[in-house]
UniProtKB/Swiss-Prot annotation:
Record-linked HAMAP family: IlvD (MF_00012)
Entry's Gene Ontology molecular function annotations: 2 iron, 2 sulfur cluster binding; dihydroxy-acid dehydratase activity; magnesium ion binding
Top-rank taxon, per record: Archaea
Biological process (GO), any one: L-valine biosynthetic process
Cofactor names: [2Fe-2S] cluster; Mg(2+)
Catalytic activity reported: (2R)-2,3-dihydroxy-3-methylbutanoate = 3-methyl-2-oxobutanoate + H2O; (2R,3R)-2,3-dihydroxy-3-methylpentanoate = (S)-3-methyl-2-oxopentanoate + H2O
Keywords, in A-Z order: 2Fe-2S, Amino-acid biosynthesis, Branched-chain amino acid biosynthesis, Iron, Iron-sulfur, Lyase, Magnesium, Metal-binding
Residues annotated as catalytic: 470 (proton acceptor)
Gene: ilvD
Cofactor mode of binding and number, as noted: Binds 1 [2Fe-2S] cluster per subunit. This cluster acts as a Lewis acid cofactor.
Record bears the keyword Plastid: no
EC number in record: 4.2.1.9
N6-carboxylysine: residues carrying this PTM: 121
Protein name: Dihydroxy-acid dehydratase
Amino acid sequence: MRSAIIKEGPERAANRSLLKATGVTDAEMKRPFIAVVNSWNDIIPGHIHLNKLAEAVKAGIRNAGGVPFEFHTIGVCDGIAMGHEGMKYSLPSREVIEDTIELMVRAHQFDGMVLIPTCDKIVPGHLMAAGRLDIPAIVVTGGPMLPGYVDDKYTDLISVFEGVGAFRAGKLSEAELERLENLSCAGAGSCAGMFTANTMACMTEALGLSLPGCATAHAVDAKKVRIAKESGERIVELVKQNITPRKIVTYKSFENAIMVDMAVGGSTNTTLHLPALAHEFGLELPLEAFDELSRKTPHLISLRPGGPNFMLHFDRAGGVEAVMQRLSSKLHLDQLTVNGKTIGENISELEIINPKLNEEIIKTLENPIHAEGGIAVLKGSLAPDGSVVKQAAVDPKMRVHTGPAKVYDCEEDAMKSILAGEVKPGDIVVIRYEGPKGGPGMREMLAATAAIAGMGLLESVALVTDGRFSGGTRGPCIGHVSPEASEGGPIGLVKDGDLIEINIPERILNLKVSEEELEKRRSVFNPPEKKVTGYLARYQRAVHSANTGGIVD
C-alpha cells in the first residue's frame, strides 16, 4: 500500500501518533487509506448535498475494509458568477482544484480516492487530478437538479436567464419574471438540462470513471446515495487490484466519450475539458477529433437547451448507458470501467425500466434528430486555429448566415447594447478580448446569449467570441475563436460593419475583408493590456489557447 510510507515501521511512530490523534486505531493502520475528495459548500446548489453523499461514500469504504479521510476542494458556481467579473475566475479554478487535490493526496500518501464533484469546472478539475495522480480512483458526480414547473411547463435556470431578455423586450412582466426566479431552480443538483455540469458527468461515466447510472441519477434520488455507497465499496477493491485511472482511460475511451457527447448534444465546454483531461492522462486530443467524430455520430436525444427534454427525462429513459446501447456499433466496447466490467458488458446488462420513454426520448441511428453530432468545429479567416458551435441548438435558418459585425471589447458592453435594442436582425455580435489570456479567464457569454434569445432574436442574430459559452446557450453562438484577440488573432481586427460568413454545414467562419485591408489593420493593431493581480495574473502568464483545452503550464 502507498500509505505504508506514513504508517509502517518504528521510524513512523510520530506519523502514527498524529494519525491516532484523529481517532485512527491500530487495526485501521493496516487497512487502505482512502481520500474522500468532497467539493461540498453552501453556495453552489449543485454542491449543497454533497456532505450527505460523502457520508454514504465513507460508509461504503468502511463496509469494504478501508479507512476514509475526507477533505474539501473549492468550487465556483458559474450561474452566480455569470455576467460580471466573477466569471473570470471560473475556468482558472479548474487547475486550482486539480492542484489542491494533488497536494493533499501526495502529501498524505492515500492509497486511493473517491472524488465527489458536481458542477462545471469542478468535475473536470477532479478528473484531471485523477489522471495526473494515477492512483485508484472513482468519481461520484452529484447529480442533476429537478426541473421547475411554471405555467404548465418545465423550467430551469436558462428559463430565468432568457426571461431577463423577454422582460427587457416587454414580453414578460416583472411579476412573471419573479415567478420564474422563484420556481425554476428546484433545489440541490446541477442545473436541470444538458448543460456543462451534466455533460461532464456524462463524460465521466462514458470514460468509465463512475459507476453505471451515476451521471443521470438525480441529486435528491435515493439511487444516488446507493451509488455513492457502492462507489465507496468499489474503491477498496480497485486499491487491492491496483486498477488506476490510466489502466481504464485510453484514447479509445476519449473517442467513446466524444461520441456520447455528440449523441446527447453536450456543452461546447467539452472541447476545453476533454483535451485538458487527455493531457493529464499523457494523451493528445486535438480539436479536430471532435469534428471528425461529430460527422460520424448522429444527434440522438433532444435535451435542454437545444430541445424540450430535461435530465429527468433522460434518466428515466435509461441515461448514458441507453445512449451507448444505441451507439454500440460505433463504440469501443472493450474499454474497461471502474466496476471491473467493459463498456460492452455494462450496456448488455442494462435493464430499460421505461421502454416507451426510452424509444420516445432516445432516437436510433437510423432515425436520429440530426445526422451529425451536437458540436461542429469551424475554421476560416476569422478562426484559423478553430472555433466551436453547438450546432444541435442552432435553428436551421441560421446554419448559413452572412451579416454585418457589431463589435464589442467586453461582454458588459455587448449586454448593454443588446438590452438597449441596438442589435438588429441580421447582425453578428462580436465579443472579443474574452479569451483565456485576454479576459483573462475566458468568461462564458450566457447573459448575452440569453438576452438575444429572450428578445426573440435567435433566428436572426449570431454571436461570435473568443470567450466561451455556458452549456445552457442556444442559437448560432460560435465561441473559442482561436487565436484569441489578445494573441493577435483576426478577431481583434474586426470592425463594425465588416461582413462575417458563417456556414456550419461547411465548417466555415470567414471575415469577408481583403487580405490587403487586414494587413493595414494588423500593422497598427495594439491589443489593450488588462492589468490583473493575484491568481489571474499568474493564470494569464501560463494559460494556453482555447484550441488546446486552455491548459496551464
